[in-house]
Design a protein with these regions (language model features):
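A common structural junction motif
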Residues: 80-89, 195-196
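Helix-loop elements that line ligand-binding/catalytic pockets
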Residues: 175
C-alpha cells in the first residue's frame, strides 16, 4: 500500500536559503531514495496575505509518495536528505498520510491506486492537496478569486491548517487539513463564497495541469507555527469514536 508524507522545516532567516540549497543539491540522492515513487522540494507561502500569497523564505516543504510504509520508515530513520532538511531548523513537522482518492489530474506521475485504497467516510478527518499551473493570462483572475476563498477559509472552524506550496515557477498548490470529509466537501462544493469561484473555474481554466487529491492522515510529529493540525484532527476523530461495549 503506498504511503505519502509531507515534511516542513522553518529556519532562522540568515540560514534559510543556505539550508534549502543544501537540500536542493542533494536532489539526485533524493530521487534515488529506495522506495520513493515521487517527491519534490517546495517553497511555501502564507495564504493569509491578500490579494496574493506571500512566499515564506524561511520555510520549505518536501512532499513524497512511497511504495510502502517500510520505505517511509527507512527514510525517517537516517536518510541524509532528511538530516540535511532538519539541520539548523528552528521548527520541523511531518505527517504520514494514506492516499485515498485522486479526484482529478496527475502530479509528476503520482501513482493512481484508487482501486486498492480504503475509501474515506464522511466523518473521517482528511488532508486535501490542490495543484496547478497558473497561465499568465489568468494570473489576475486566479489570485482575485483566491482572495475570496481565503477569506472564507479563515472563518471556517473545520479547516485546521492550510499551507501554500510551489515546486516550480508559476504553480499554485495548497495542502489543507480538515476536521471531516463532509466539512471539506461543503466548503468546496456547497453554497457560500467558494461556489461562485468553483463554477466559472470549470468553464474557464484558471489552472492547467490540475491535480486534486485527498489523503487519510495517519500520524504526525512536530509543529507548524506552534501547532500540529493533523494531531488535532486525529484527536477529534478519536474523541468522536464510541468506546467498545
Amino acid at each position: 500500500m503506498p504511503v505519502a508524507s509531507l515534511h516542513i522545516a522553518r529556519y532562522p532567516l540568515p540560514t534559510a536559503l543556505r539550508s534549502a540549497v543544501h537540500v536542493w543539491l542533494r536532489r539526485a540522492d533524493f530521487e534515488n531514495t529506495p522506495g520513493l515513487a515521487i517527491g519534490a522540494l517546495f517553497n511555501t507561502a502564507d495564504f493569509w496575505t491578500l490579494p496574493s500569497p506571500k512566499f515564506n523564505l524561511r520555510r520549505y516543504a518536501i512532499l513524497c509518495c512511497w511504495e510502502d510504509e517500510a520505505a517511509f520508515d527507512t527514510f525517517m530513520d537516517g536518510s541524509p536528505l532528511i538530516e540535511a532538511f532538519h539541520r539548523g531548523a528552528s521548527e520541523t513537522w511531518h505527517a504520514k498520510l494514506e492516499p485515498a482518492t485522486v479526484l482529478e489530474g496527475q502530479w509528476r506521475g503520482w501513482p493512481d491506486e484508487s482501486a486498492e485504497l480504503t475509501p474515506l467516510e464522511d466523518d473521517d478527518p482528511v488532508c486535501v492537496m490542490t495543484y496547478g499551473r497558473v497561465p499568465i493570462r489568468q494570473t489576475w483572475t486566479f489570485w482575485r478569486a483566491n482572495g475570496i476563498v481565503v477569506r472564507q477559509a479563515r472563518e471556517n472552524p473545520a479547516m485546521l491548517g492550510w499551507l501554500g506550496l510551489a515546486d516550480r515557477m508559476g504553480t499554485a498548490s495548497t495542502f489543507s487539513v480538515w476536521r471531516s470529509v463532509a466539512e471539506a466537501k461543503t466548503f468546496a462544493y456547497g453554497p457560500g463564497d467558494h461556489a461562485p469561484v468553483v463554477r466559472p473555474s470549470r468553464t474557464v481554466p484558471w489552472l492547467e495541469n490540475r491535480f486534486f487529491a485527498r489523503f487519510r492522515p495517519l500520524s504526525s510529529a512536530g509543529t507548524i507555527d506552534g501547532r500540529d493540525p493533523v494531531a488535532e484532527a486525529l484527536s477529534r476523530d478519536l474523541a468522536a469514536t464510541p468506546s467498545p461495549g
